Amino acid sequence: MREFLEKCKEEYTLKIPQLLKEVRLKTHYTKWSKTVLPAYQLEPFDTELLGYKLGRFLKNEPQINKHVKHYFFDSEDKIVGRLEYDFYNNYEKEWVVTRFLYIYIQDGIFELKLSSSHITEEPTKINRITYVRLFNDKVIESYNLHNDNRFSKLVYKYSDNKIVSIERDLWIPNLLKSIYEIEYPDENTYIIWEIDNDSRVKIYPKEDS
């Protein structure tokens, strides 16, 4: 799978201008958020595995500031792009942003995190490529390849249409394995535990959250 992502990264890098144009053409409506963490995640529980809550969409367009994020959706309510405002360059008098592109193929979705650039410029590189494999519209596996050669694989297991465990293999470059269990006390609440040998460590929600 690493080789597959490397090949896709090379191919999509050459198509960045075309892919950015397709986002503009496909966009049917947009949403906003202004939290440090995004309000959308392709990989299930990606934010929560870090111990944090997922951001929330706003009802109205906010004033542009650091951490503001703009999401682009097509006519089928699929996300096709995301733009994050990183910081304002006082010398150039314009914002530096990071763009994300979403590409849909049969039984899978790609997320491309592009290199940061001024908002009036087009990025030229892909800093991270993520691929999620779908089965019956559910994410069953995800793969990440970073510019620093970090590579990860996550496997999601379901029960009653809910994710109940996640197994992660991370190469940095040595292999690190992690196992997480997810409990659902009720329909609106979930708890994530990291399994460490015979013990369980609660990682979400944090006790002070």
What are these regions (language model features)?
Residues 1-209:
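Buried hydrophobic residues that stabilize the cores of well-folded domains
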